Amino acid sequence: MKQLREKIEELLSNSKCTKEEISSIMREKALYPFSRESRILAYLMSLGEITYDEYAKLDEDYCSRNQFLELFDMAPRTYGQTWGEEYIRKLFPQFVKATKENLADVYPDFDGEFDLWLDGIRIEVKACRANSTKSSGSLASRAYLHTEAHDAGFKYHYQQLKPSCCDVFIWIGTCRDTLLYWILSSDELLKTGKLGSQHRNEHTGTADNPVFEGQVFMTEDELLPFFVNEENILDAVYAKGKSRIDK
């Protein structure tokens, strides 16, 4: 919204609109799906200050910058535990949802400890939304563009990580305008030295426990060695998963 408002201010400053006209429009109540911004743009079109094609370009640019903004409105549990896993399975149907029923023949001891299964590879999916922690307001109002997240040194937070219970992690980073993907084996996670205790309970919160549950805070630069393009997710999981299984 910041970029759109700056563009509208630029258009207004170069238009013939008076301050009184602008103030009158801004004072009027706006209800969804209308907004003060759309009202001003419509007014500018009515005056011939901008063409419909220029309006359409503003709309296209706004949608491109905010194509994943709706994910910031999701409840934490829905986003963190449901959306990421379902999104990956939509991209690659080869991934099997890990349930007792689905794995009865190939992994009969399954007890909910990982999310997806791929030809013997156990996979855990985690997602994190990039947002400013220095301002107040809703999560959506603080959502970062990719460039903003990188420039701010945003640390992606992945929690409830159980490297002893899976072979490969798929981590999704959500920005307003793009999704980022990092694929790493559980061995690679341990080698980062970033895995810290989450202190969830006495059974999984200590490092010497067989099922240690931890969390990481890592910047995009720190995650760079594990970055993959969306179309390469399946191949990366195969490569890292099979390498670990075959050890």
Segments and roles (model prediction):
Residues 1-114, 127-247:
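Nucleic-acid endonuclease domains
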Residues 122-124:
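Short hydrophobic-acidic sequence motifs that mark active-site Asp/Glu residues
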Residues 116-120:
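Active-site beta-strand termini and strand-to-loop segments that position acidic
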